[in-house]
Every structure is written in structure tokens, then in C-alpha cells.
């Protein structure tokens, strides 16, 4: 380990497909939480609750999902036919953008915060033709981790983008399943959501706005189950979610987030996976077609 400004940069070697990959992690820690953030994607890979000994962030087991808490940029979701048209030029896109698969630079660190930077490059311009700086900052404050994004347009033309979070919250015990947990949305009696296209070839992964549905809540809560994710994510538009909690089925809070002002919000998991993703999005890709 290399110590930098009272922070520890943990150097891991991971063997992938016969190749050795080095991953650098920055560590934040106080009396309540231990947080690790990777320079790969500026992604939180661990939040450990010292009080009850639980790991809150999904560990990235590829049996279900290889990621932990990716940053989604410059597009949230999937574009129609995986294409994006900008100033008359067509670009091929990937679901949720390229930031999550990019190596960021750690530009600042203290005992309680870390800041990562992704600069535009010739490589990013093959997918997204704008000059930019993307800062992803994490602040450890008591029992909370605060996330801040700063997007700077360093070019001379209007820059279009969306950005979002995709944290996966793992269940506290290994033998727990979705029905052991409830989602709580304070102040809400019901929510409207749309689904993702899972059938048409061109529109696969895009939102279907004409199929709006209602998620009925009881005492602001919804009992998690496998079937709700049969069609992939639930997409909630219209700035419906400002606060969301994952709670044990007896109502005891497990982990929550505040996300005021986000126009869209995603809820997602994988079949039989012991985690659920709560995803505040500042915009998203267009609907199917």
C-alpha cells in the first residue's frame, strides 16, 4: 500500500482471462464506516458498516453482476439501436456510457474526501465528440457518504449529456432474499413507472413510455419480490423520488439515500440476486423509437 495525504492507495492484482490487471483503491474511514473507491470508473466498491459488521455495497460477483456502484456518463440507459446522432455525425454508444469503464485520476484526497477526474481524450471522442472534465467526489461525513459530480464543458459548443448513479445494495445476510426486504419512499402512496423493452431487436433496453404502470404502496412501502424485475428495471420519471430506503421486512432501516431534484430514478436487480439497485438519474436516454 502507498500512503498519499493520509489516504491509502491499495494496489490489487486481479487475474482476468489470463492477464494480470492492477486496480487501485482509495480508502476513506471514520469510526462508523470504511469506504473504498476504485480509480476504475471512480466506483465505490465497498461500504463497510463497523457498527454491525455488514458490507452494504454489492461485492461484484459476476454470477449476478460484476459491478458495484458505477457512474453513468455521458448517457444513462441505452440509446435506440445503440446509436447517437450529434451534429449530423453518428456515434456508437454503449449502455450507460463509457465512464464506468474508464480509468480516472485521483486529483485530491484527505481523511474524509476523495476526488477523481476523467478528461476527454481522442479515445472518448470516438464515442462522444465533446471536450469535458468529469469530477466525481466522495465525502465521508459521520454515517453518510455524499456523492458529488461536476461536469465541465471545456469546448466551445453546447455539450449534451446525462449522468446518474447505479449503486447496488447487497442484503445484510447471505441467506436473505428479496422478500426479506421492503422499499420505503417517504411521503408516497403510489408511484408511476415504465418498463424497458426486452423484445424488439432495435429497441432492446430502451424505455417503453406508452406502458405506464402504477406501483401501489402501503404505508409508503413496497415489499420486494423477484417478479417485479421480470422486465428489467423500473423507470420512474417526473422527479417522483427524493428519498428512498431499503428496510428489513420488520421496517428497520438498512440503507437509504436522499436525491432531491433528480428527474428520473431507476430500481433494478437480477433474478435471484441478493441485492437491489436504487438509481437517481439526471436525465436518461430517449424512449423506444
Task: Please place each PLM-identified region on the residue numbering.
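Beta-strand-rich N-terminal accessory domains
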Residues: 1-86, 90-94, 239-260
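Extended, loop-rich substrate-binding clefts of extracytoplasmic carbohydrate-active enzymes
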Residues: 4, 16, 89-142
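Acidic, contiguous internal or C-terminal segments within carbohydrate-active enzymes
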Residues: 28, 120-174
Amino acid at each position: 500500500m502507498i500512503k498519499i495525504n493520509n489516504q491509502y492507495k491499495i494496489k490489487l492484482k486481479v487475474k482476468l482471462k489470463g492477464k494480470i490487471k492492477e486496480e487501485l483503491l482509495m480508502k476513506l474511514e471514520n469510526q462508523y464506516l470504511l469506504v473504498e473507491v476504485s480509480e476504475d470508473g471512480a466506483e465505490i466498491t465497498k461500504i463497510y458498516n463497523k457498527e454491525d459488521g455488514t458490507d452494504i455495497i454489492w461485492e461484484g460477483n459476476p454470477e449476478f453482476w460484476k459491478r458495484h456502484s458505477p457512474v453513468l456518463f455521458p448517457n444513462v440507459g441505452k440509446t435506440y439501436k445503440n446509436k447517437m446522432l450529434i451534429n449530423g455525425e453518428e456515434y456508437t454508444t454503449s449502455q450507460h456510457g463509457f465512464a464506468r469503464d474508464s480509468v480516472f485520476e485521483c486529483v485530491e484526497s484527505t481523511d474524509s474526501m476523495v476526488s477523481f477526474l476523467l478528461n476527454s481524450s481522442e479515445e472518448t471522442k470516438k464515442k462522444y465528440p465533446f471536450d469535458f472534465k468529469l469530477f466525481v467526489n466522495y465525502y465521508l461525513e459521520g454515517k453518510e457518504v455524499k456523492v458529488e459530480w461536476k461536469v465541465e464543458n471545456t469546448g466551445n459548443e453546447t455539450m449534451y449529456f446525462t449522468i446518474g448513479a447505479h449503486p447496488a445494495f447487497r442484503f445484510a445476510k447471505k441467506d436473505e432474499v428479496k422478500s426479506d426486504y421492503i422499499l420505503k419512499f417517504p411521503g408516497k402512496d403510489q408511484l408511476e413507472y415504465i418498463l424497458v423493452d426486452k423484445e424488439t431487436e432495435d429497441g432492446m433496453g430502451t424505455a417503453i413510455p406508452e406502458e405506464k404502470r402504477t406501483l401501489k404502496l402501503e404505508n409508503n412501502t413496497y415489499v420486494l419480490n423477484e417478479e417485479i424485475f421480470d422486465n428489467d428495471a423500473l423507470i420512474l420519471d417526473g422527479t417522483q423520488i427524493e428519498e428512498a430506503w431499503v428496510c428489513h421486512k420488520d421496517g428497520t432501516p438498512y440503507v437509504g439515500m436522499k436525491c432531491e431534484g433528480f428527474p428520473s430514478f431507476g430500481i433494478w436487480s437480477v433474478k435471484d440476486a441478493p441485492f437491489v439497485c436504487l438509481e437517481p438519474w439526471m436525465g436518461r436516454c430517449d424512449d423506444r423509437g
